């Protein structure tokens, strides 16, 4: 008599967690950080059509890593939820904390009830309404529905340890936009110990902000010449042909 294959609930959860973590780690990293005028998103993303950063509502932004089709479904669902609530009640009733809680409940249900968890990690950010003075809010939502309120910055995807270490050393509160971009890009360029730092330019970065100084819709993408002007100068490699003759 053969017995059916049995796996304990604890083992099943461990295997699901490992699957999700590996899928998220395969992606490229995203940094979201608070600066003097709002929230800055910087994602390592060479694709111009598959975007990791987007607007959810008037004062709320979204960033994600992992499987694109999975986090894009969540993004669209969040937009629909926000639009419906804003229409039924008031636009100010739509908050980042509310959307983060909805995402946490959704991912928690998927993790426990479906055969395969979503291989995604999300960040929901919100800035104060125009004329208000409230600190930006950053929420990290993981694949199992866990939610955390981050005071300064969020790092997701790829190898996060060197990026977090770089931000712990270089992050400053109330930095200007130019300084914040430099801090984020240098942190994203950080590599594991012993490896050379990578060079990131406009063609490999997706950059956007939530600008608390904008009257209604705070979200704005930064591309082209505006992005080039904000990026730190790349070090020039020495060329033997340019050396002066002795």
Curated annotation (Swiss-Prot):
Among InterPro entries, the record links this protein to: Ntn_hydrolases_N, Proteasome_alpha, Proteasome_alpha-type, Proteasome_asu_bac, Proteasome_sua/b
State the deletion phenotype.
Answer: Cells lacking this gene are viable and grow at the wild-type rate, but show a large reduction in the rate of degradation of the pupylated substrates. Cells lacking the Pup-proteasome system (pup/prcS, prcA and prcB) completely lack pupylated proteins and intact proteasomes; they grow as well as wild-type during the exponential phase, but they show reduced survival after prolonged incubation at stationary phase (17 days after inoculation) and become hypersensitive to nitrogen limitation, and, to a lesser extent, to carbon limitation.
**Does the record bear Cytoplasm in its keywords?**
yes
Query: Which UniProt keyword terms apply here?
Result: Cytoplasm, Proteasome, Ubl conjugation
Which segments of the protein form a coiled coil according to its record? none
Superkingdom per UniProt: Bacteria
- Which pathway does the UniProt entry assign to this protein? Protein degradation; proteasomal Pup-dependent pathway
Q: How is it modified after translation?
A: Pupylated at an undetermined lysine residue by the prokaryotic ubiquitin-like protein Pup with the help of the ligase PafA, which leads to its degradation by the proteasome and thereby constitutes a negative auto-regulation.
Task: Please provide one cellular component term from the Gene Ontology annotations of this protein.
Answer: cytoplasm
The record's family statement is: Belongs to the peptidase T1A family.
Q: What is this protein called?
A: Proteasome subunit alpha
Organism in which the protein naturally occurs: Mycolicibacterium smegmatis (strain ATCC 700084 / mc(2)155) (Mycobacterium smegmatis)
């Amino acid at each position: 008599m053969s017995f059916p294959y049995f796996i304990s609930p604890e083992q099943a959860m461990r295997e699901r967690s490992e699957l999700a973590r590996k899928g998220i780690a395969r992606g490229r990293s995203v940094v979201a950080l608070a600066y003097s005028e709002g929230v800055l998103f910087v994602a390592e993303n060479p694709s111009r059509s598959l975007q990791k950063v987007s607007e959810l509502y008037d004062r709320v932004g979204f960033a994600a890593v992992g499987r694109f089709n999975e986090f894009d479904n969540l993004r669209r669902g969040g937009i629909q939820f926000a639009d419906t609530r804003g229409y039924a009640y008031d636009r100010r009733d739509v908050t980042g904390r509310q959307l983060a809680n909805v995402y946490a409940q959704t991912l928690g249900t998927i993790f426990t009830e479906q055969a395969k968890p979503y291989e995604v990690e999300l960040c929901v950010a919100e800035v104060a309404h125009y004329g208000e003075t409230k600190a930006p809010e950053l929420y990290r939502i993981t694949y199992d529905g866990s939610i955390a309120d981050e005071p300064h910055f969020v790092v997701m995807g790829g190898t996060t340890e060197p990026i977090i270490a770089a931000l712990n050393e270089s992050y400053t509160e109330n930095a200007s936009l130019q300084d914040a971009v430099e801090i984020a890009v240098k942190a994203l360029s950080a590599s594991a110990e012993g490896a050379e730092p990578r060079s990131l330019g406009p063609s490999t970065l997706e950059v956007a902000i939530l600008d608390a100084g904008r009257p209604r819709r705070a979200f704005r993408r930064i591309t082209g010449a505006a992005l080039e002007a904000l990026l730190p100068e790349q070090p020039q490699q020495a060329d033997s042909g340019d050396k002066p003759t002795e």
